[in-house]
């Protein structure tokens, strides 16, 4: 018999034993899958409140608590035993004696398995070695676990299993649980900051008749009643700009976005973004907002603006470095795209510097490829790269001094993009021309180029005030602030291949 077959047979034996115990509970009139249970404390509340009291003080005060959670360890024999109960906040030891809980409840304790959910009422005390514990006066089985937890010492070694069975990961891996609690706090802090600065949170459609707001392949679905194709949104942008037209001057939305693209440590087809728009602002205002927002979140959630990511120490305290994309390319490669160059010259530069390009690319595309291939991953400390070429920025306002470029920036930290923002294009005639240029790109083979959105152009024709806009990938921000190497580590249920 192979080791795998042996393990499978052993698991089947354990499953049967647990089901037998479940049936025995039912035979004894006990529901193995209980209903409501009222507790007075979480484990860490007990520890925080009473850890500093001496053994004698605890005996004198006779403090009673009721706690509930999952049994993670168990030891002892005869008429007494110890176990560790785990809840949301951590673990606490319980001590169960037959003469304290009675014969029936002690039998339930003795037959309980690791992973079972239990409720305990008892007195807080300290053991002889000083561990704060709860001496049970009542022991109740709340839910019988019919499957054993992963082995205590080996845990979930298979990373893919951690992602597929996140519920097990959360049970046995405190760091994973901490990551997702921190994620929630990050989003809460983000909301509070924006609410306090006068932004209005809104909700806009997830299914669009025309995909827009980003260069990406959409997921396509079909509305049966209307008999029309619909697209899962690839960005939140265009509906929020319509709201700016309508007079909602400072808006934001936190929501899911869907892009039918590859999966990597940085990409998941379904991810969370925040997009915000502010009337009468420009990209420089949004730069200031971005660095202050991120620094505020770090300070509020982590208590510091200096964080560790991998081997790098990152300083999030404003102000952050600002550099034009053309200057960044010139510093790194010596190629000066401030000079007027032809497509042929740009292609020669790319060949000389081993920058991979496609035949359909213009000078602006090639400048961007220089940046992405030669510079992006070197930007470790927070850096705003601004002045993107107009060809890759169809929704951004042209720079008035050099219309080859736009008033746009991207934020890079630890070599990856974390935010994208610009002074929004509010000229409907220019916007139509940009969409038409994008259509030509699609015809030339760029299937991520924008489609024409007549409704959006019509909205601009009613007049959109000068506006600054921002998009931040929340998953990547959480990765940064929790020192997570993969986006899957910060998504509760990342997209996986079918087994």
From Swiss-Prot:
Ligand binding (Mg(2+) 1): 410, 417
Main localization category: cytoplasm
Subcellular location as annotated: Cytoplasm
Cofactor note: Binds 3 Mg(2+) ions per subunit.
Gene Ontology MF term list: ATP binding; catalytic activity, acting on a protein; lysine-tRNA ligase activity; magnesium ion binding; transferase activity; tRNA binding
InterPro entries noted in UniProt: Aa-tRNA-synt_II, aa-tRNA-synth_II, aa-tRNA-synth_II/BPL/LPL, Lys-tRNA-ligase_II, Lys-tRNA-ligase_II_bac/euk, Lys-tRNA-ligase_II_N, Lys-tRNA-synth_II_C, NA-bd_OB-fold
Top-rank taxon, per record: Bacteria
Xref: SUPFAM superfamilies: Class II aaRS and biotin synthetases (SSF55681), Nucleic acid-binding proteins (SSF50249)
Reported cofactor(s): Mg(2+)
GO cellular component, one term: cytoplasm
Catalytic activity: tRNA(Lys) + L-lysine + ATP = L-lysyl-tRNA(Lys) + AMP + diphosphate
UniProt family annotation: Belongs to the class-II aminoacyl-tRNA synthetase family.
Subunit structure: Homodimer.
Protein name: Lysine--tRNA ligase
């Amino acid at each position: 018999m192979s080791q795998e077959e042996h393990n499978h047979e052993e698991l089947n034996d354990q499953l049967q034993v647990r089901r037998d115990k479940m049936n025995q509970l039912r035979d004894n009139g006990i529901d193995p899958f209980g209903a409501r249970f009222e507790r007075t404390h979480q484990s860490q509340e007990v520890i925080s409140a009473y850890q500093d009291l001496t053994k004698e003080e605890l005996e004198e005060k006779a403090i009673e608590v009721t706690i509930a959670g999952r049994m993670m360890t168990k030891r002892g024999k005869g008429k007494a035993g110890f176990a560790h109960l785990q809840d949301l906040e951590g673990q606490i030891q319980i001590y169960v004696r037959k003469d304290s809980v009675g014969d029936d409840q002690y039998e339930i304790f003795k037959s309980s398995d690791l992973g079972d959910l239990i409720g305990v009422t008892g007195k807080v005390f300290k053991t002889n070695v000083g561990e704060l514990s709860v001496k049970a006066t009542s022991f109740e089985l709340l839910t019988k676990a019919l499957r054993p937890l992963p082995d205590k010492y080996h845990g979930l070694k298979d990373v893919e299993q951690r992602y597929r069975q996140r519920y097990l990961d959360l049970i046995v891996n405190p760091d994973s649980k901490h990551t997702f609690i921190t994620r929630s706090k990050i989003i809460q802090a983000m909301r509070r900051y924006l609410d306090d600065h006068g932004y209005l949170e809104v909700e806009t459609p997830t299914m669009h008749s025309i995909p827009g707001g980003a260069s990406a392949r959409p997921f396509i679905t079909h509305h049966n009643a209307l008999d029309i194709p619909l697209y899962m949104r690839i960005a939140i942008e265009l509906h929020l700009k319509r709201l700016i037209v309508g007079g909602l001057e400072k808006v934001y939305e936190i929501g899911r976005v869907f892009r039918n693209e590859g999966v990597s440590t940085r990409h998941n087809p379904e991810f969370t973004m925040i997009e915000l728009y502010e009337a009468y602002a420009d990209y420089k205002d949004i730069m200031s907002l971005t660095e202050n927002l991120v620094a505020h979140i770090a300070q509020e959630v982590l208590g510091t603006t200096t964080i560790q990511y991998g081997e790098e120490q990152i300083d999030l305290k404003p102000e952050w470095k600002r550099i034009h994309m053309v200057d960044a390319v010139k510093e790194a490669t010596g190629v000066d795209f401030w000079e007027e160059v032809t497509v042929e010259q740009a292609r020669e530069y790319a060949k000389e510097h081993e920058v991979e390009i496609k035949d359909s690319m213009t000078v602006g595309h090639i400048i961007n490829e220089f940046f992405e291939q030669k510079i992006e991953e070197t930007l470790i400390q927070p850096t705003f790269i601004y002045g993107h070429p107009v060809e890759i920025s169809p929704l951004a306002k042209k720079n008035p001094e050099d219309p080859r470029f736009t008033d746009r920036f991207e934020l890079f930290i630890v070599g990856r993009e974390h935010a994208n923002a610009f002074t929004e294009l509010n000229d409907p005639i220019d916007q139509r021309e940009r969409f038409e240029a994008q259509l030509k790109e699609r015809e030339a083979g760029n299937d991520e180029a924008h489609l024409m959105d007549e409704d959006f152009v019509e909205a601009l024709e009613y007049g959109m005030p000068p506006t600054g806009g921002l998009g931040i990938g929340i998953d990547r921000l959480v990765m940064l602030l929790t020192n997570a190497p993969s986006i899957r580590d910060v998504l509760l249920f990342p997209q996986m291949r079918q087994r």
